[in-house]
């Protein structure tokens, strides 16, 4: 896919749009940073103090882009939590996430997290990721509450998200040299100690037991490099050194020829934490062992702090991309035989000549 022009990278002051747990399991959302003041000149520039903020969010006096609600977000509900940050190089946050909790018909609890990464070289990637995260989360909750098995619910939720992103192509005028709105997706459900993961694209899921001894990646990227390695056409070093390495071969969007959700279900053999994230995090610690060294030891009991730490880790190492991470603690270990994946599943049957789409602007 042709790459677009790079955006204007403006650093904005930190903004925190957050939801935190209250006693009884509810959440209280912090107000939109602009919602408590009238629209117009009463808004004050965080850089120069002028009260001249235009409708696009820029200061007419110094030109500084003002913080937006999506620049930094944190949410936590019944243990499952997520943190998203714009990073230091992009002018907006094109990642999105959702976290939720519900009950199954038998009374058992279930927690859900969805993370999506908008394709920067497509039209309105921020809207694509938000639409996918919201629609997938809603579909998962509805299915789980109706008694649908998590793996089936996951597949259906990803397809629901795909359809919603498809619809955006008709809602926006496509920008020149850009594809229709598009994004990746990764999602996880934890219920009664059992984990189900689903994904399309290169957003990832990892499993970290409390002792970190069996840490592993649960997903396989839908990417050009992955396909070359799995086909035996290139070594891993050769494939990932190629300029086409990070071109994704699976995504949600009207330009995707076919959406094929991948799913994985397993029962952990020990308490631990499921982590799902965009490449804004894993680009700085790709291997499970490397990422395990960064995940705080108390991630299962303090997941929000752990998510904050991981987002900060990515930003401290350059923040070249938006970064989003969600954590789902797994406290309960079933007494029956655990089922643990030995390695990430392979994409058996996927065509090696599938179309690709560039994730970020400037890639070729």
Where in the sequence are the language-model features?
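PP2C/PPM-type serine/threonine phosphatase catalytic domain
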Residues: 1-364
